[in-house]
């Protein structure tokens, strides 16, 4: 018997990009009000290893038992603090440890997006345009759009 790994590549979620200046907890609060869901901050942040170290992204989660739909509000931008050694070319020639912050992204191909709303198992049950229209009524949400999942190069970052 042979396993076909193509079966695991099947995408059973929708992804909505959200452009906003809101903090994650405020956005989650407004989404809860507008969409009648109950997103709660997850204890387990999403961890991704980048060349500068470990990156952590906040996640708010809600599982709708009746419809078996999983909702996740995911931070796309964060910073990784990493150590840099710099030689001081002075009389005493010291090596200085510097901390540098580097911007990192959950999905690097979408650098302008602040958050993603990932909705799993939502094929027939939800109207994504209606969800986007409701998200767009939140103050400080500049724009939302459905992400073409075929354009995502870093799909593995969405498996958690």
Enumerate the language-model features and the residues they cover.
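Short, well-structured beta-strand/strand-turn elements
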Residues: 36-48
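Short, surface-exposed beta-strand/loop "edge" segments at domain boundaries and coil↔beta transitions
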Residues: 23-28, 66-70, 81-82, 123-129
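Short, flexible, solvent-exposed loop/turn segments with mixed acidic/basic and small polar residues
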Residues: 2-9, 101-112
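Surface-exposed, low-hydrophobicity interaction/linker segments
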Residues: 50-99
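Terminal, regulation- and interaction-focused segments at domain boundaries
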Residues: 5-23
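Amphipathic alpha-helical segments
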Residues: 22-38
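Glycine-rich, aromatic-bearing surface loops/beta-hairpins
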Residues: 104, 112-160
């Amino acid at each position: 018997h042979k396993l076909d790994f193509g079966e695991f590549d099947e995408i059973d979620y929708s992804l909505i990009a959200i452009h906003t200046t809101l903090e994650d907890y405020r956005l989650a609060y407004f989404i809860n009000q507008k969409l009648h869901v109950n997103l709660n901050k997850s204890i387990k942040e999403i961890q991704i290893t980048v060349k500068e170290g470990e990156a952590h992204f906040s996640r708010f989660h809600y599982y709708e038992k009746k419809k078996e739909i999983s909702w996740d509000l995911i931070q796309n931008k964060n910073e990784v603090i990493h150590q840099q050694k710099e030689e001081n070319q002075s009389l005493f020639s010291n090596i200085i440890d510097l901390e540098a912050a580097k911007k990192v992204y959950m999905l690097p191909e979408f650098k302008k997006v602040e958050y993603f709303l990932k909705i799993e198992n939502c094929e027939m049950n939800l109207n994504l345009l209606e969800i986007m229209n409701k998200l767009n009524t939140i103050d400080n949400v500049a724009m939302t759009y459905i992400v073409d999942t075929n354009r995502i190069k870093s799909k593995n970052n969405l498996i958690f």
